[in-house]
Amino acid sequence: MTAPIQSKMATRVAIITGVVFVIAGLPKFIGFGWEVANFTRFGLPVPEAWVIAAGVIEIGGGALLIARRWVRFSCLVLALTMAVAIVVSGLGRGDIIPSLTLAPALLIACVYLGTNPPMQR
């Protein structure tokens, strides 16, 4: 792929991935009690702290991807978050949706963006 095409593709992937992360992070605060119940079911200690951390990471990281700022750092943190989601809730508890569908797709998008970051605005 040529550089301009690659950059346009990376820009689109960054924006779309960022929007998905922001949307995924909002329920951590809007439906806090429901999310805490899920995180409790996953066997995580201090589930309230995990819910808040996940929400901040998803919304903050998603916003940085949309703005195309600190893309590699954001993708590293977001990829680690998705890896935890896959292992803890997907493989650990058998939650197919979203932990074994959306989380792996977002992990792949983060790896792509981490190795092919879009140009900053």
Language model regions located:
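Membrane-interface interhelical connector segments
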Residues: F32-P45
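Extended, low-polarity transmembrane helix blocks
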Residues: M1-I30, W50-V56, G60-R121
